[in-house]
């Protein structure tokens, strides 16, 4: 008799995806982040669902409802901080996952990579709208500044902004629709992640060497289920330590003041995971130019498969590309720091240089490095 997991229509799908899936025998811990992102999404949906039971999406009571969750709801403070810091955890895993994809040439699986970029945009949109919901000072002014950027679009800009706001400023209508979108988007992300997996399983996983591994495959379970489980335990340990000991470390103190349209905070800035893009936006003095640079800073990822010039897929044996890759990571850290600083010298020029370097490495230097490495290999 056939085992039920191999015969039952539903179990069969799970079996092919997580149990009997042939996986390369040499994938490292950098391949753990896909499953960890799935865990992050589950944590966010679960904690978000419980928060939504007590939250009120009305400008008069949103701030109070968050205070009520923290003070009066059983373990409400814990659920709130798990959800707030869970977003940071999500983006840490997301950026590490993308970094691994760039380093090991996983972007050559074009469909999987492009769905991944769609997932990144969806996650960023969800996080931005979620940041508005507590209706603190930084929530309100962050929403005002970022949505206002759309007014830079020629001809339709102003109408578009007013349409998104549902009025002439960020107000009750904006908060209600942001809550609705913030609730539905994680489920869309989950569905898109399924498509991401579907495309990945069409080709099979890449591996650190960047060479075909069809001749040496092992079943996903038990090898990688237990390897992923170790990652889960480490991740949850670090996460819970953070939530229970430093819950407000990554938040903005301004968000503990209720939104006030008549009082602007001295420095308006988004959460830390958007600061690199915010720094690129601010480095261009022109409003429309800044918005284009902001979108391109993420959309440029879609060009990686087209700009791959090296004969080898992975950067494992490409020292020049490795140097450029780690320069890019350092550059992103500098941009993140600059995004949190006021717009004054010397931060302006540092941000502009870092922004130019960011695009130069991706669009120019990495493809040239690939060609140079091809020449070196022929010597």
Swiss-Prot record:
One of its GO terms (molecular function) is metal ion binding. This is Cytochrome b. It holds the Pfam family Cytochrom_B_C. Heme 1 (or BL or b562) is low-potential and absorbs at about 562 nm, and heme 2 (or BH or b566) is high-potential and absorbs at about 566 nm. The chain crosses the membrane at residues 33-53, 77-98, 113-133, 178-198, 226-246, 288-308, 320-340, 347-367. InterPro entries: Cyt_b/b6_C, Cyt_b/b6_C_sf, Cyt_b/b6_N, Cytb/b6-like_sf, Cytochrome_b, Cytochrome_b_C_euk/bac, Cytochrome_b_N_euk/bac, Di-haem_cyt_TM. PANTHER family: CYTOCHROME B. The cytochrome bc1 complex contains 11 subunits: 3 respiratory subunits (MT-CYB, CYC1 and UQCRFS1), 2 core proteins (UQCRC1 and UQCRC2) and 6 low-molecular weight proteins (UQCRH/QCR6, UQCRB/QCR7, UQCRQ/QCR8, UQCR10/QCR9, UQCR11/QCR10 and a cleavage product of UQCRFS1). This cytochrome bc1 complex then forms a dimer. A ubiquinone binds at residue 201. SUPFAM superfamilies: a domain/subunit of cytochrome bc1 complex (Ubiquinol-cytochrome c reductase) (SSF81648), Transmembrane di-heme cytochromes (SSF81342). The keyword Membrane applies. GO terms for biological process: mitochondrial electron transport, ubiquinol to cytochrome c. Its main location: mitochondrion. It comes from Chaetodipus goldmani. It comes from the Eukaryota. Keywords: Electron transport, Heme, Iron, Membrane, Metal-binding, Mitochondrion, Mitochondrion inner membrane, Respiratory chain, Transmembrane, Transmembrane helix, Transport, Ubiquinone.
């Amino acid at each position: 008799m056939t085992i039920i997991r191999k015969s039952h229509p539903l179990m069969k799908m799970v079996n092919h995806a997580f149990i009997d899936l042939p996986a390369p025998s040499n994938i490292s811990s950098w391949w753990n982040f896909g499953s960890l992102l799935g865990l992050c999404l589950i944590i966010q949906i679960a904690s978000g669902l419980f928060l939504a039971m007590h939250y009120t999406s009305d400008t008069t009571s949103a701030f109070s409802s968050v205070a009520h969750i923290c003070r009066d709801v059983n373990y409400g403070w814990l659920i709130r901080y798990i959800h707030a810091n869970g977003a940071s955890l999500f983006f840490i895993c997301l950026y590490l996952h993308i970094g691994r994809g760039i380093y090991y040439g996983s972007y050559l699986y074009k469909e999987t990579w492009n769905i991944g970029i769609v997932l990144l945009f969806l996650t960023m949109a969800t996080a931005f709208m979620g940041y508005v919901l507590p209706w603190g000072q930084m929530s309100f002014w962050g929403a005002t500044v970022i949505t206002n950027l759309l007014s830079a679009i020629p001809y339709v800009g102003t109408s578009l902004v007013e349409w998104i706001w549902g009025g002439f400023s960020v107000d009750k209508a904006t908060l209600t629709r942001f809550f609705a979108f913030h609730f539905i988007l994680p489920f869309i992300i989950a569905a898109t992640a399924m498509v991401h997996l579907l495309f990945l399983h069409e080709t099979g996983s890449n591996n650190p060497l960047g060479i075909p591994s069809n001749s040496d495959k092992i079943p996903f379970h038990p090898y990688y289920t237990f390897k992923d489980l170790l990652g889960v335990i480490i991740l949850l340990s670090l996460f819970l330590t953070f939530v229970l000991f430093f819950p407000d470390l990554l938040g903005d103190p301004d968000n503990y003041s209720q939104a006030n349209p008549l009082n602007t905070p001295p420095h308006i800035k988004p959460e830390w995971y958007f600061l690199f893009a915010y720094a690129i936006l601010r480095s261009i003095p022109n409003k429309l130019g800044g918005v284009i640079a902001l979108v391109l800073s993420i959309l440029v990822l879609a060009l990686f498969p087209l700009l791959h010039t090296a004969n080898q897929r992975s950067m494992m044996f490409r020292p020049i590309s490795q140097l450029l890759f780690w320069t890019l990571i350092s550059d992103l850290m500098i941009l993140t720091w600059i995004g949190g600083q006021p717009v004054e010298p010397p931060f302006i020029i540092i941000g502009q240089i870092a922004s130019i370097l960011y695009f130069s490495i991706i669009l120019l230097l990495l493809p040239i490095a690939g060609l140079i490495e091809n020449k070196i290999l022929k010597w």
